[in-house]
Amino acid sequence: MAPSADEVAVRAALQHYIQGHATGDSSHMRLAFHRQARLFWSSADTLATRTSDEYIQRMGSGKPAADEATGVRKRRIELVDVTGNAAIGKIVLDYPEAHIVDYMSLLKTNGEWKIINKIFMTEMKKK
């Protein structure tokens, strides 16, 4: 069965997020995240949080990682589930130094799907 228009739009929002990581271009992230979005994670067993604006500003130089062209950085959308105007997405970022799993909550507002919440875990790889 072909994906619904909403599933295609959710995947497009998640793809903007992935492109932001791949290119270092914050404009992709701004297309992915709602302006009021928040990020949460556990650091040393303590809840940590930041706004999407803070996250996007910390992205760095606006250029791709030095090893981006080598193909060692892998990114994929593993799951999308849409119900009405709410959706979830699971993204896996497999980098040489870390394995990251992002769980995104998305809402459709004003006809657009945006990430409104991100929780994630990072597992550093042994060198």
Predicted regions and their residues:
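Short, solvent-exposed mixed-charge patches
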Residues: 1, 126-127
